[in-house]
UniProtKB/Swiss-Prot annotation:
InterPro entries: Ac_CoA_lig, ACAS_N, AMP-bd_C, AMP-bd_C_sf, AMP-binding_CS, AMP-dep_synth/lig_dom, ANL_N_sf. It catalyses: acetate + ATP + CoA = acetyl-CoA + AMP + diphosphate. Acetylated. Deacetylation by the SIR2-homolog deacetylase activates the enzyme. Its cofactor is Mg(2+). This is Acetyl-coenzyme A synthetase. HAMAP family: Ac_CoA_synth. One of its GO terms (molecular function) is AMP binding. CoA binds at R190, G191, G192, R193, T310, S522, R583.
Length: 647
């Protein structure tokens, strides 16, 4: 297997940005950031063009981040109105339902505009004003996009809660931001199962602290019988269908709040990441066009849920601001068969495909046949997002899914960053499997040691960012001090990402996992991601998760949870084979002290492995597991506890 995939000259010739252009623009973006971002901001339509481009301080006594602060615009106008003249009849949303035999549907930019205006008018009729918070708890259906853009149109701040979260999670988020209104559906559909969304909202609103909610709008999706509580609950369609199809957009200052999105897995009080209007929209639209080398006739599919930042930035705001045709998929990669993703790609002639390593590894586990039953000839670019992709999965994605002809953009970014920060550009960057490669324009990454000393050249350390970019979060909602303490206090005058990272001799960046996913063995620091990648590279291993546990001699030991590919069974011989494999690939220091076979791993509904829970199982501390309600399948925890090895 090659560890370097050089730029395809034909791709570079047609790409938006080639290598020379990247170097020129990157230099300009670092040396003259205000001039650079002023020019980029002109891609949007402003009521009042900004003249004050950047006003940022990372000083602990005065952390503030403001971009385009005297500009005025509206996000929904940029995603809808400005496309009506030339793209009014172009498909904005291609909706593919959960069930493959259910009809898919198309919504044009004009139809989406009219529906957003109708909901905007309905929200105003219900007393929602600029600055009010609206919670959106919907499945992956077109009305979720409508709800987001309708809030943006009237200046309401949306807080989307992932449709897999239960009542307590909804209540926490409603309570924290003081929502006046919730938009939900009778039920969701996912993998052939019904999700009781309205019932979850009802349960949430019985929890103390949710009394700010005055109205619940309910989309009739499955048609099942549900409880409606009058006068609080209203049917969405009854109210929205009668509204006018024109709705005057609110003039928003660039620094007016656009949305709050709560980070998953945080302990205690939820962390409400706040993004504002101008900088976020400039950054998401620019990164979407540039990273995906966007063309007018592309069919773009990001498989994330709208409840996560990837859905906000790269299903809704970035793509629609660019006038893209976006595929919206309600289902799962495994329903009704493991060929579903590839069948949907063929059905809708998808050209750009953006998914998570978790999905790639899960489908790789099923073998090549389900993929090869389909053609996927429409694809021209593949993307990866959400966590580091191990080289083995990268190669499979490239060779099998992309037929060895589609470059992969392995993108690194966070809820807090708003958009992609480190990524290849297909016409400018040679690819290394497992590396997120080089920084995007305006991004100044650096590596520091635990004392905050900058590490030059090839090195491994903590990833920090030395300067701001327009898409950066502005604060944590209602808790600016926590924002400062979380992101700026650890290494003063920098933004601390919380991620460990390695930089190689070519200046390429390799994300090694969260800093708390580093194991210190006898004074040697080793990233769990490196051990995991090595285990997954073994031909019989589908997935692996590695955590540290207290060791009486070494300080920390290595505990590995291993899921085998379909058809393989655990054995002592295979156990020894894996230990030998790790010794050969990394060295004796990385050999796991314990290997536990796991039929599945505990994951959040967004697909992230909950290593916090795996650590507690490894430590034999079941009473310290904490909240497991965000897991897709909490029963896995009991299974792992029961099978836990004694040590």
């Amino acid at each position: 297997m090659s560890d370097l995939y050089t730029i395809d000259p034909m791709l570079a010739k047609d790409a938006h940005i080639d290598r020379a252009h990247y170097k020129t623009l990157y230099h300009e973006s670092i040396e003259q950031p205000e001039a650079f971002w002023n020019k980029v901001s002109q891609r949007l339509e402003w009521f009042k063009a900004p003249t004050k481009i950047k006003n940022v301080s990372y000083q602990l006594e005065d952390v503030h981040i403001r971009w385009f602060e005297d500009g005025e615009l509206n996000a929904s106008v940029n995603c809808l109105d400005r496309h009506l003249t030339l793209r009014g009849d172009k498909t904005a949303l291609l909706f593919e339902p959960d069930a493959p035999d259910a009809p898919s549907s198309r919504i044009t930019y004009r139809e989406l505009y009219e529906r957003v205006c109708q909901l905007g008018n309905a929200l105003r009729h219900l007393g929602i004003e600029k600055g009010d918070r609206v919670t959106i708890y919907l499945p992956m259906i077109p009305d979720a996009v409508v709800a987001i853009l309708a809030c943006a149109r009237i200046g309401a701040i949306h807080s989307v809660v992932f449709g897999g979260f239960a009542a307590n999670s909804i209540a926490d988020r409603v309570n924290d931001c003081g929502s006046k209104l919730i938009i939900t559906a009778d039920e969701g559909l996912r993998g052939g199962r019904k999700i009781p969304l309205k019932a979850n909202v009802d349960a949430a609103l019985k929890i103390h602290g949710t009394q700010s909610v005055e109205t619940v709008l309910v989309v009739r999706h499955t048609g099942s019988t549900i409880n409606m509580h009058t006068p609080r609950d209203r049917w969405f369609h009854d109210l929205v269908d009668i509204q006018a199809t024109e709705c005057a957009p609110e003039r928003m200052n660039a620094e007016d709040s656009l949305f709050i999105l709560y980070t998953s897995g945080s302990t205690g009080k939820p962390k409400g990441v706040l993004h504002t209007t101008g900088g976020y929209l400039v950054y998401t639209s620019y990164t979407h066009e540039t990273v995906f080398d966007l063309r007018e006739n592309d069919i773009y599919w990001c498989t994330a849920d709208i409840g996560w930042i990837t859905g906000h930035s790269y299903i809704v705001y970035g793509p629609l601001a660019n006038g893209t045709t976006v595929l919206l998929f309600e289902g799962t990669p495994h329903y009704p068969t493991v060929s579903r993703f590839w069948e949907v790609i063929d059905k809708h002639h998808v050209t750009l495909f953006y998914t998570a390593p978790t999905a790639i590894r899960a489908l790789m586990r099923e073998g090549d046949t389900p993929v090869k039953k389909t053609s996927r000839k429409s694809l021209r670019l593949l993307g990866s997002v959400g966590e580091p992709i191990n080289p083995e999965a990268w190669h499979w994605y490239y060779t099998i899914v992309g037929n060895g002809r589609c470059p992969i953009v392995d993108t690194w970014w966070q809820t807090e960053t708003g958009g992609i920060l480190i990524t290849p550009l297909i016409g400018a960057t040679d690819l290394k499997p497992g590396s997120v490669t080089l920084p995007f324009f305006g991004i100044r990454p650096a590596l520091v040691d635990t004392n905050g000393q900058t590490l030059d050249g090839p090195a491994a350390g903590n990833l920090v960012l030395l300067d701001s970019w327009p898409g950066q979060m502005r604060t944590l909602y209602g808790d600016h001090q926590r924002f400062i303490d979380t992101y700026f206090r650890t290494y003063p005058n920098t933004y601390f990402t919380g991620d460990g990272c390695r930089r190689d001799a070519d200046g390429y960046y390799w994300i090694t996992g969260r800093v708390d996913d580093v194991i210190n063995i006898s004074g040697h620091r080793i990233g769990t991601a490196e051990i995991e990648s090595t285990l997954v590279a073994h031909p019989k291993v589908a997935e692996a998760a590695v955590v540290g546990f207290p060791h009486p001699i070494k300080g920390q030991g290595i505990y590995a949870y291993v899921t085998l590919i379909t058809g393989e069974t655990p054995s002592e011989a295979l156990h020894q084979e894996l230990l030998t494999w790790v010794r050969k690939e990394i060295g004796a220091i990385a050999i796991p002290d314990h290997v536990q076979w796991a039929s599945n791993l505990p994951k959040t509904r967004s697909g992230k492995i909950m290593r916090r829970i795996l650590r507690k199982i490894a430590e034999n501390a079941p009473d310290q597991l904490g909240d497991t309600s965000t897991l897709a399948d909490p029963s896995i925890v009991d299974l792992l506890l029961n099978e836990r090895l004694k040590h």
